[in-house]
Curated annotation (Swiss-Prot):
Lineage: Bacteria, Bacillati, Cyanobacteriota, Cyanophyceae, Synechococcales
GO molecular function, one term: electron transporter, transferring electrons within the cyclic electron transport pathway of photosynthesis activity
Gene coding for it: psbC
Record-annotated membrane-spanning stretches: 36-58, 99-121, 143-165, 221-240, 256-276, 412-436
GO biological process: photosynthetic electron transport in photosystem II
Chain ranges on the Lumenal, thylakoid side, renumbered to this chain: 59-98, 166-220, 277-411
Residues given in the record as [CaMn4O5] cluster binding sites: E341, R344
Protein name: Photosystem II CP43 reaction center protein
Subunit structure: PSII is composed of 1 copy each of membrane proteins PsbA, PsbB, PsbC, PsbD, PsbE, PsbF, PsbH, PsbI, PsbJ, PsbK, PsbL, PsbM, PsbT, PsbX, PsbY, PsbZ, Psb30/Ycf12, peripheral proteins PsbO, CyanoQ (PsbQ), PsbU, PsbV and a large number of cofactors. It forms dimeric complexes.
Membrane topology: Multi-pass membrane protein
Gene null: resulting phenotype: Unable to grow photoautotrophically or evolve O(2). About 10% mostly monomeric PSII accumulates, which corresponds to RC47, an intermediate in the normal path of PSII assembly. The intermediate is able to bind the primary and secondary electron donors and acceptors and can transfer electrons.
Major localization listed first in the record, in broad terms: membrane
Length: 460
């Protein structure tokens, strides 16, 4: 029987020689570094091909007169957030940049695909045959940390690419720009470590919101400067040093262990991304992704306040059915907030609402005299595009399923990342358990001799 703790038999790519059936995928290539490289490069090619093809699909179906979030788009909003093809208020001014991004991804996917095919079929089975620099052994702790170092440097460069785009190559879209958002060059990113790392020390609940509470582009770009430099510095550190004794003893050093570590990290990122896209309207502007749930609720309260005020209602003193303020009331800390069911979202901050605030919450004088037409239009739009799928009202938002066919990209992205994060967590636990069992020498493995498929006739 072949197990991960008994790999002396591993040599080919079939079940008898590796102990892994075809559906075990890359496990068959544990000791074939060249073939494993081919699998990884081809996988990257498939990912990039999807990105390019799906971008062109969205470009082909794009309707300029409708907001992106009403068209089920999940890729064009990311390109627009980077400042390509959009202008004031997030209006699409040119779809050619979207087309270019899609084509570039298709071209690069072809290069990656050819590289994957080459390494899978023609290249050296084991990279050590080609170069000692690219060769590795899963138990070679120093080489493993070298590979970590290369990855960290690439990740750091990726973070700095966003910085360069924001500061030197046309800027990025800032939903907080005056008048309803615009593309803006970030000239003064936040570098103060107390501010950047202060986000990590915030509570993850309520108005604190941990890193998800970031509400300005200066902090986002400054954070990427810090992350980029930290990743590059960490990469250089891991290349130049060898693992300390405690790390050698505490960690499991095998291919499956590295897989489990990676899945755990991706799971954490998935959960963070899920919450980020659900709550944050700075990194994920509502002009492209649609309003947050809290934003839609506050928009509805604002829309009806504007309507009834024009009809003569006294918004300051009108009472609702509970005896609380119908339009305005006090928060627990004394701020003036919207009344009604949306009171639970009194912590909400949005670029269309903030101009109407004063030193103590919403400013009554501004609500009576300074509401601008663009704020009313945007609130009405957001009110009818809540990222909700409920049969009843949520936060006071009417979610009648008979209205029109709409699913918010925010709901798609938040849900998909949460579900994927959960499955990656399960995968992390599964592979971590197997890796530790293999290292301890008591892994059972699966007795392939009694596997039913081995006794079935060929399909043809």
């Amino acid at each position: 029987m072949v197990t991960l703790s008994n790999t002396s038999m591993v040599g080919g790519r079939d079940l008898p020689s590796t102990g892994f059936a075809w559906w075990s995928g890359n496990a068959r290539l544990i000791n074939l570094s060249g073939k494993l490289l081919g699998a990884h490069v081809a996988h990257a090619g498939l990912i990039v091909f999807w990105a390019g093809a799906m971008t062109l699909f969205e470009v082909a179906h794009f309707i300029p007169e409708k907001p992106m979030y009403e068209q089920g788009l999940i890729l064009l909003p990311h390109i627009a957030t980077l400042g390509w093809g959009v202008g004031p208020a997030g209006e699409v001014t040119d779809i050619f940049p979207f087309f270019v991004v899609g084509v570039l991804h298709l071209i690069s996917s072809a290069v990656l695909g050819l590289g994957g095919i080459y390494h899978a079929l023609r290249g050296p089975e084991v990279l050590e045959e080609y170069s000692s620099f690219f060769g590795y052994d899963w138990k070679d702790k120093n080489q493993m940390t070298n590979i970590i170092g290369y990855h960290l440097i690439l990740l750091g460069c990726g973070a700095l690419l966003l910085v360069f785009k924001a500061m030197f190559f046309g800027g990025v879209y800032d939903t907080w720009a005056p008048g309803g958002g615009d593309v803006r060059v970030i000239t003064n990113p936040t570098l103060n470590p107390a501010i950047i790392f202060g986000y990590l020390l915030k509570a993850p609940f309520g108005g604190e919101g941990w890193i998800i509470s970031v509400n300005n582009m200066e902090d986002i770009i400054g954070g990427h400067i810090w992350i980029g430099l930290i990743c590059i510095s960490g990469g250089i550190w891991h290349i130049l040093t060898k693992p300390f004794g405690w790390a050698r003893r505490a960690l499991i050093w095998s291919g499956e262990a590295y897989l489990s570590y990676s899945l755990g990290a991706l799971s954490l990122m998935g959960f963070i991304a899920s919450v980020f896209v659900w709550f944050n309207n700075t990194a994920y502007p509502s002009e492209f992704y649609g309003p947050t749930g809290m934003e839609a609720s506050q928009s509805q309260a604002f829309t009806f306040l504007v309507r009834d005020q024009r009809l003569g209602a006294n918004i300051a003193s009108a009472q609702g059915p509970t005896g609380l303020g119908k339009y305005l009331m006090r928060s627990p800390s004394g701020e003036i907030i919207f009344g009604g069911e949306t009171m639970r979202f009194w912590d909400f901050r949005g670029p269309w609402l903030e101009p109407l605030r004063g030193p103590n919450g919403l400013d009554l004088d501004k609500l009576r005299n300074d509401i601008q037409p663009w704020q009313v239009r945007r609130a009405a739009e957001y009110m009818t595009h809540a990222p909700l799928g409920s049969l009843n009202s949520v936060g006071g938002v009417i979610t009648d399923v008979n209205s029109f066919n709409y699913v918010s990209p925010r709901a798609w992205l938040a849900t998909s990342h949460f579900v994927l994060g959960f499955f990656f967590l399960v995968g992390h636990l599964w592979h971590a358990g197997r890796a530790r069992a293999a290292a301890a020498g008591f892994e059972k493995g699966i007795d392939r001799e009694t596997e039913p498929t081995l006794f079935m006739p060929d399909l043809d």
